[in-house]
Structure formats: C-alpha cells, structure tokens
C-alpha cells in the first residue's frame, strides 16, 4: 500500500475518532464528517485512477454531490437548532420531540 493511501486512511480514521470523541457539539461533528467525506473522495479517486476503471469515473463526483447535500442539510439543522435553543450541544437536546 503506497504511503499516500496510508495517509488518507489515517486521515479517515482520525476524522472518525474525532466524530466519536467530539459528538457533543454539532459543529464539531459536521467538520469531522466533512473530513471523512474528503478523505473518501481522495481515496476513491486514487483507487479508480490506479486500477483504471473507466466505467466508474463518475463515482467521486457523485460522492462530492452527496457531501455537498449533507453539508447543506447539516448547516441548515445547525442554524435551526442554534436559533431555537441558543446552543449547539447535542446532549442537551431532545430531537425526537415534535
């Protein structure tokens, strides 16, 4: 495994651990999720270019589209929660109430 793949995999696991450790704040969770999506994009691009799969060149672009949708929905939820409750602590909120 080349060193760039090891570094990207390490970045993914670091973002995953950050998401598990800093899950009390929504903004920290969103940043870690974006780091995970970025490392998945780079790793999938490298794998597709190394294996030369011509049929799956659109997969990283599709991953970026889903990452942009996830970021927009996450930021909209963050704004809604901070306007309603005045903070972004996830542990203090009961999001299942209507």
From Swiss-Prot:
**What is one process in the GO biological process aspect for this record?**
ATP synthesis coupled electron transport
Under the heading InterPro entries, the entry gives:
NADH_UbQ_OxRdtase_chain4L/K, NUOK/Mnh_C1-like
Membrane topology qualifier: Multi-pass membrane protein
Q: Where in the cell is it found?
A: Mitochondrion inner membrane
Claim: Transmembrane is one of the keywords in the record = yes
Matches recorded under Pfam families? Oxidored_q2 (PF00420)
Predominant location: mitochondrion
What are the record keywords, sorted?
Answer: Electron transport, Membrane, Mitochondrion, Mitochondrion inner membrane, NAD, Respiratory chain, Translocase, Transmembrane, Transmembrane helix, Transport, Ubiquinone
What EC number is given for this enzyme? 7.1.1.2
The record lists the catalysed reaction(s) as:
a ubiquinone + NADH + 5 H(+)(in) = a ubiquinol + NAD(+) + 4 H(+)(out)
Q: Does the keyword DNA-binding apply?
A: no
One MF annotation (Gene Ontology) recorded for this entry: NADH dehydrogenase (ubiquinone) activity
Q: Which residues cross the membrane?
A: 2-22, 29-49, 61-81
> One GO cellular component from the entry?
respiratory chain complex I
Chain's role: Core subunit of the mitochondrial membrane respiratory chain NADH dehydrogenase (Complex I) which catalyzes electron transfer from NADH through the respiratory chain, using ubiquinone as an electron acceptor. Part of the enzyme membrane arm which is embedded in the lipid bilayer and involved in proton translocation.
Family designation: Belongs to the complex I subunit 4L family.
Assembly behavior:
Core subunit of respiratory chain NADH dehydrogenase (Complex I) which is composed of 45 different subunits.
Under which name does UniProt file this protein?
A: NADH-ubiquinone oxidoreductase chain 4L
């Amino acid at each position: 495994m080349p060193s760039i793949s090891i570094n990207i995999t390490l970045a993914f696991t670091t973002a995953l651990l950050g998401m598990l450790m800093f899950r009390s704040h929504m903004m920290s969770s969103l940043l870690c999720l974006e780091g995970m999506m970025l490392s998945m994009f780079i790793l999938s691009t490298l794998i597709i270019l190394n294996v030369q799969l011509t049929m799956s060149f659109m997969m990283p672009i599709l991953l970026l589209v889903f990452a942009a949708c996830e970021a927009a929905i996450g930021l909209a939820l963050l704004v809604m929660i901070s306007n309603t409750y005045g903070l972004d602590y996830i542990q203090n909120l009961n999001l299942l109430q209507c």
